[in-house]
Amino acid sequence: MKQDIYIRIKAFDCSLLEKCIREFIDQLKQFNADLSGPIALPRKDSKFTVNRSPHVDKKSREQFEMRISKRLIIVHNPTSTMMKMLADLSFSAGVEVDLKVKEVNI
């Protein structure tokens, strides 16, 4: 049985996301990891509309937008040292990392 690690990285700021991905891939390439990605996943856009005034002027509104960019990196056949490095890795504020280990039947 082989294992794959699916690493999903999310951030509000696209430039911060790309910087973290570069650092992440550089760390993995030190271990000669077999990688797929980064794969761009669909961006999630959320819009919020609020009233400017608390009492009157219903027509006066303000809109805010939040964009969440996502990338996926797949590590094939990770070693135990790679797993330890992934567990100890820290990212800057505003970047969310989700790790999933999947068994692959061949």
UniProtKB/Swiss-Prot annotation:
MF-aspect GO terms: structural constituent of ribosome; tRNA binding
Keywords: Ribonucleoprotein, Ribosomal protein
GO cellular component: ribonucleoprotein complex; ribosome
GO biological process, one term: translation
InterPro entries from the UniProt entry: Ribosomal_uS10, Ribosomal_uS10_dom, Ribosomal_uS10_dom_sf
Coiled coil region boundaries: none
Family of the protein in this entry: Belongs to the universal ribosomal protein uS10 family.
Function: Involved in the binding of tRNA to the ribosomes.
Protein's name in the database: Small ribosomal subunit protein uS10
Gene: rpsJ
